[in-house]
């Protein structure tokens, strides 16, 4: 199973840290953006190619730093239409060539369309509020259900009570029973503790979460979860993040 490959890769890397790739054109260095504008003219094409170069540099950083996985935000590229989809495909191919586990954050409700194509990533994220249909069984691929989001109005739905638990917990339990990983974006230890208590065997993907708040997600051997960091830009950033995580979580 693909989830088992991910956990094996994290154990091999001796770190639960993954690199999040969600660039905006504003992050691209001005000289680099200007270079593409001089070649291609101002507009979406130049911006998209600048994003491609920038994202490939981040992927190279993950490879050189020995990280096991990357999580790519589809929304960073798909607004550019077919050009953005091409960049996204290039990143998935490059991650595969570098033997980096690649998850694309599509937040789709129909993951089969993305996981059965020729250039499919190792896993995708889904929004589970359509029910179990968003967690199909696809050989050697993983699905991660985004059950707890950090957007301002997320709690309007996620905190509704379903029986004796919040709706996000009820959905997480259903998705976990189908073999999905669970995505938590809030960074709050209480959310992490509750999901780990209710879903003891589920793999948790934690975004915007420091080592202290992430600790409840891991077992005594440092297994069972992954922390995604979107702020890493240099090798020293990665090493600092690894060291900080290791103060709380050690993979055996």
Predicted regions and their residues:
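Conserved N-terminal beta1-alpha1 strand-loop-helix module at the mouth
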Residues: 1-87, 96
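N-terminal active-site wall of soluble small-molecule enzyme domains
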Residues: 64-120, 153, 189-192
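Short, acidic/polar
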Residues: 48-62, 110-118, 168-169, 213-216
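C-terminal functional extensions of proteins
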Residues: 218-252
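A C-terminal functional module that forms or caps the active site or interfaces directly
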Residues: 52, 182-232
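Active-site-adjacent beta->alpha loops and helix N-cap segments on the catalytic face
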Residues: 79-94, 110-113, 128-141, 187-199, ...
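Structural preference for beta-strand elements that scaffold enzyme active sites
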Residues: 16-20, 68-71, 101-103, 122-125, ...
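Conserved anion-binding
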Residues: 24-25, 37, 42, 110-181
């Amino acid at each position: 199973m693909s989830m088992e490959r991910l956990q094996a890769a994290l154990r091999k890397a001796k770190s639960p840290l993954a690199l999040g790739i969600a660039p905006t054109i504003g992050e691209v260095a001005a000289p680099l953006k200007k270079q593409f504008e001089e070649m291609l003219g101002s507009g979406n094409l130049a911006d998209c190619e600048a994003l491609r170069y920038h994202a490939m540099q981040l992927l190279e950083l993950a490879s050189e730093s020995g990280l096991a996985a990357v999580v790519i935000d589809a929304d960073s590229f798909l607004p550019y239409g077919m050009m953005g989809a091409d960049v996204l495909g290039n990143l998935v191919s490059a991650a595969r060539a570098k033997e980096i586990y690649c998850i694309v954050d599509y937040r789709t409700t129909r993951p089969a369309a993305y996981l059965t194509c020729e250039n499919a990533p190792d896993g995708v994220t889904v929004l589970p509020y359509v029910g179990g249909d968003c967690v199909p069984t696809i050989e050697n691929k993983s699905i991660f259900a985004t059950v707890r989001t950090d957007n301002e109005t997320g709690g309007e739905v996620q905190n509704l009570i379903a029986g004796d638990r919040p709706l996000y917990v009820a959905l997480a339990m259903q998705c976990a029973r189908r073999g999905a990983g669970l995505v938590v974006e809030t960074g709050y230890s209480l959310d992490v503790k509750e999901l780990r208590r209710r879903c003891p065997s589920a793999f948790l993907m934690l975004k915007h979460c420091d080592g202290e708040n992430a600790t409840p997600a891991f077992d005594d051997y440092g297994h069972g979860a992954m922390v995604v960091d979107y702020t890493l830009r240099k090798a020293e950033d990665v090493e600092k993040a690894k060291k900080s995580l290791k103060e709380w979580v050690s993979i055996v």
